[in-house]
């Protein structure tokens, strides 16, 4: 995890809020560093994590996790991490006969209109364990990234339904957290992606939006991060708070600074 990002969010693994949905969004840049942050954050918080990885392999996340001080292999072996490798699973679903229901069952069903098998996978992965097994602080669902489901033929409404049922189970029933990534293509004609992004934005308690620089590439500033806290239960004056920082990604950390305050500029 990135300590500077924790400081900006005013949180640590031992005092994170529960029952929250965090939306990660990237536009004209790669926001995967946010996924790696939250994955390592919740593993260090001793949470039970269900990771639906639709865009990269387990080895990719494992290599980055080692740099951030967590072992995904050990976490999976001890039952703390349940990992659905979408790339590999998609091949199995399409080219191999499956007797048992598969989380990505919709890939081989032309008229599949829902993600119920994927939800059942998440619910089974995060259900409370018996008292004799390892006890985790609370469950966490992490998805990277939901936009892939649209590319695979699912509609935005079906994906939002999936998120609704996951929230009901993970956030409300089990008092856990959810973190999902959605890519913002910036294409005005991509109505499905806009519906998904807007729907999730209204449901989220925290939105982290990574954006590329309007001026283009810079060696010392890789992008900017917009942080939006949404607190519906608070008075109007304190309901939504937004801050913007620029950042530079390094090998094992990310540095954040106010706009125009890069050490290279000063």
UniProtKB/Swiss-Prot annotation:
A GO BP entry is: cellular response to stress
Domain of life of the organism encoding this protein: Eukaryota
Q: Which GO terms describe its cellular component?
A: cytosol; elongator holoenzyme complex; nucleus
The UniProt record lists the keyword Cytoplasm: yes
Q: Does the keyword tRNA processing apply?
A: yes
Name the principal localization, coarsely classed: cytoplasm
Q: How does it assemble?
A: Component of the elongator complex which consists of ELP1, ELP2, ELP3, ELP4, ELP5 and ELP6.
Recorded family membership: Belongs to the ELP6 family.
Query: What is the protein name given in its UniProt record?
Result: Elongator complex protein 6
- State the encoding gene: ELP6
């Amino acid at each position: 995890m990135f300590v500077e990002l924790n400081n900006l969010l005013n949180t640590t693994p031992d005092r994170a809020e529960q029952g929250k949905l965090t939306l990660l969004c990237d536009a004209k840049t790669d926001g995967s560093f946010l996924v790696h942050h939250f994955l390592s954050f919740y593993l260090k918080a001793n949470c039970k994590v269900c990771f639906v990885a639709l865009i990269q392999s387990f080895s990719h996340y494992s290599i980055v996790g080692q740099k951030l001080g967590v072992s995904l292999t050990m976490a999976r072996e001890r039952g703390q991490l349940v990992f659905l490798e979408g790339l590999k699973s998609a091949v199995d679903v399409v080219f191999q006969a499956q007797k048992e229901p598969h989380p990505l069952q919709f890939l081989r069903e032309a008229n599949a209109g829902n993600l119920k098998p994927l939800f059942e996978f998440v619910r089974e992965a995060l259900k409370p364990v018996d008292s004799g097994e390892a006890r985790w602080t609370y469950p966490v669902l992490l998805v990277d990234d939901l936009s892939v489901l649209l590319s695979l033929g699912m509609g935005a409404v079906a994906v939002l339904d999936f998120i609704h049922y996951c929230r009901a189970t993970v956030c409300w029933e089990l008092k856990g957290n959810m973190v999902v990534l959605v890519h913002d293509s910036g294409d005005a004609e991509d109505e499905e992606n806009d519906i998904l992004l807007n729907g999730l934005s209204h449901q989220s308690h925290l939105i982290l939006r990574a954006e590329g620089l309007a001026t283009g590439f810079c060696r010392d500033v890789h992008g900017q991060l917009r942080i939006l806290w949404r607190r519906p239960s608070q008075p109007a004056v304190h309901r939504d708070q937004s801050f913007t920082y620029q950042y530079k990604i390094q090998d094992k950390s990310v540095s954040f600074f106010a706009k125009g305050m890069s050490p290279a500029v000063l």
